């Protein structure tokens, strides 16, 4: 059976290194994009099972990336977990309009993140909290 792919989109390389170790230790394949442009390039090669998306990104911000993804039939159904230092209420409209699986405020507990990743993959992003 193929490993499920978790794609992190965040320009924080230290966070990426830490999450790579944690996510791979749980049996997932880990991919990393440092910005929205890299995300769109990766999506053209391999479709991930879940995307961990930061809102504050260089070049193309997380809001714009998410809107572009949702317009494309190939990517519209990928569950997205927002990882952001912004409070949930500040991205509330995005959360509802763009069908976000979960919102996790930074800093976060990796155990909680792993539970949300598992749930997002299992339910395909259809459950929201």
Regions found by a protein language model. Give the residues of each.
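Alpha4 helix (beta4-alpha4-beta5 surface) of REC/receiver domains from two-component response regulators
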Residues: 64, 86-104, 111, 115-118
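Charged docking surfaces used in two-component/phosphorelay signaling
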Residues: 17-25
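Active-site beta3 strand of CheY-like receiver
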Residues: 46-52, 57
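Residue-level signal for the "D+5" position in two-component response regulator receiver
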Residues: 32, 57-60
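Acidic catalytic/metal-coordinating carboxylates
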Residues: 35, 61-67
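Short hydrophobic/Thr-rich beta-strand motif most characteristic of the beta2 strand and flanking loop
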Residues: 27-34, 42
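The feature encodes the CheY-like receiver
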Residues: 16, 58, 76, 88
């Amino acid at each position: 059976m193929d490993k499920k792919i978790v794609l992190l989109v965040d320009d924080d390389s230290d966070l990426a290194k830490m999450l790579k170790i944690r996510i791979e230790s749980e049996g997932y394949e880990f991919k990393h994009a440092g910005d929205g442009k890299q995300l769109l390039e990766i999506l053209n090669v391999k479709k991930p099972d879940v995307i961990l998306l930061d809102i504050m990104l260089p070049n193309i911000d997380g809001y714009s990336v998410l809107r572009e993804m949702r317009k494309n039939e190939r990517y519209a159904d990928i569950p997205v977990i927002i990882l952001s230092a912004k409070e949930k209420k500040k991205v509330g409209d995005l959360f509802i309009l763009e069908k976000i699986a979960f919102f996790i405020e930074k800093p976060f507990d990796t155990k909680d993140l792993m539970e949300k990743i598992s749930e997002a993959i299992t339910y395909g992003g259809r459950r929201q909290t």
